[in-house]
């Protein structure tokens, strides 16, 4: 059998004696052997999450992620294997600041994981693409790939009936009901508290362990811990809960303002602009419900930036040493303060806040 991944295969029967001949013929015609990349999934289910509000949260985020995958890919999650994800990541890691070469890589990516596209050219880069445009495409494809990978990792295994999805992921999510804690969260949000709906305390064991190991290793103190915001579209939130905010050491560094790092904001308003909330400034959200992350981060000697220069696009952990973060101040270059972290062990999840359009 042969055909596109995700489509019904074209089946013909031939004698085994002509296998090698037919195989070589199809390979020469441009077909690719995907046998080792395909996978078979089970139809088990997870144990139900007990808390109603947490169950509704995870269900909503799964639905948002699933809808994004269905609207972008012509293959389902069950038809994608870990090997295909790895191969797709390898393709993304090869991106440069050369639009022609990058378009060739995009075509390879679309062949590996077929997309729903009326016109492929609409998803490619213009010949004169600026670094920021290239970075936007890299971010677009990386987000979709992480969504797909997270949905795959959410597929139940044989022993799933004994665990909830959160237990499988070493993740704890509990609603914040303490009035003092709620007041503190809202006060920190400032005027943005007008769209506060509810908050959940998040404990990701893997990211927490990395954070506290880094904290101890570098002799940080309590006063070095800061709580800043990170906004993302609804479709990305499940992946962030599962993985945290992680950096890919092989990722191409093309068009980031202060280099490739984790970008956080001291003001909720700045990060809300990146969420799916209706009218959000940066991504033009259209949803009445959106989510904002509060990240716990640690640093004690930030590199302060008051005026941006083009050389700052190539900032890295080693280049800002002995500083351990970038604090870019609002002013001539930025509307709002921004914090950039270059080691993902310095950041872990604290809260996910539900926002409602008022």
Question: What does each model-identified segment do?
Answer:
Residues 4-28, 210-358:
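Segments that shape or occlude catalytic/ligand-binding pockets
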């Amino acid at each position: 059998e042969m055909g596109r991944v995700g489509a019904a295969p074209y089946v013909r029967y031939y004698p085994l004696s002509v296998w090698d001949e037919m195989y070589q013929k199809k390979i020469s015609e441009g077909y690719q052997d995907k046998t080792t990349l395909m996978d078979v999934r089970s139809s088990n289910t997870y144990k139900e999450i007990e808390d109603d509000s947490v169950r509704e949260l995870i269900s909503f985020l799964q639905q948002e992620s699933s809808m994004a995958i269905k609207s972008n890919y012509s293959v389902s999650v069950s038809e994608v294997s870990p090997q295909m994800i790895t191969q797709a990541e390898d393709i993304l890691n090869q991106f440069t600041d050369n639009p022609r070469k990058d378009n060739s890589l995009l075509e390879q990516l679309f062949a590996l994981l077929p997309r729903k596209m009326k016109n492929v050219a609409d998803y490619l880069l213009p010949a004169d693409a600026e670094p920021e445009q290239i970075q936007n495409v890299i971010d677009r494809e990386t987000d979709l790939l992480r969504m797909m990978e997270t949905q795959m990792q959410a597929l139940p295994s044989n022993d799933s009936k004994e665990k909830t999805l959160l237990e499988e992921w070493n993740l704890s999510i509990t609603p914040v009901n303490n009035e003092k804690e709620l007041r503190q969260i809202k006060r920190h949000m400032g005027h943005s508290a007008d769209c506060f709906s509810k908050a959940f305390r998040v404990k990701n064991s893997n990211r927490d362990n990395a954070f506290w190991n880094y904290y101890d290793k570098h002799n940080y103190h309590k006063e070095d811990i800061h709580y800043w915001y990170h906004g993302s579209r609804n479709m990305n939130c499940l992946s962030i809960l599962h993985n945290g905010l992680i950096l890919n050491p092989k990722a191409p560094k093309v068009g980031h303002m202060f280099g490739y790092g984790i970008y956080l904001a001291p003001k909720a308003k700045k990060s809300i602009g990146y969420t799916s909330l209706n009218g959000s400034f940066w991504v033009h959200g259209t949803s009445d419900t959106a989510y904002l992350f509060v990240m716990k981060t640690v640093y004690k000697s930030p590199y302060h930036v008051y005026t941006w220069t083009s050389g700052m696009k190539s900032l890295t952990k080693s280049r800002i040493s002995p500083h351990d973060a970038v604090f870019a101040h609002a002013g001539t270059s930025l509307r709002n303060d921004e914090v950039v972290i270059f080691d993902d062990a310095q950041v872990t999840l604290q809260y996910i806040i539900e926002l409602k359009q008022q």
